[in-house]
Amino acid sequence: MAAWSPAAAVPLLRGTRRLPLLHWAQRMFASQTEAELKVTQILKEKFPRATAIKVTDISGGCGAMYEIKIESEEFKEKRTVQQHQMVNQALKEEIKGMHGLRIFTSVPKH
């Protein structure tokens, strides 16, 4: 049996480094995950006047971190912190199982 050498490990390292990129590329073209769809549905119910809702799992697919972008008339005349509190309240049960959440809110421009 041949002894281990750093040169022998190079192909393994190359493959390992490419895996996250490959996973990211596949994820970019995939439809929403079940968890993303669930969060989207909850937000649609809580913000019926929303003109745009986008939920993205930014944790690499494990469901620990999400980015939420939501545009709704319900946010009109509210400060950003109040808008984010509304989203947090709507997702209070789901947030318990998350590591983190990035929220971007806006009011539609007419």
From Swiss-Prot:
Its main location: mitochondrion. It is found in: Mitochondrion. Keywords: Mitochondrion. One of its GO terms (cellular component) is mitochondrion. Gene3D superfamilies: BolA-like. Interacts with NFU1. Belongs to the BolA/IbaG family. Acts as a mitochondrial iron-sulfur (Fe-S) cluster assembly factor that facilitates (Fe-S) cluster insertion into a subset of mitochondrial proteins. Probably acts together with NFU1. This is BolA-like protein 3.
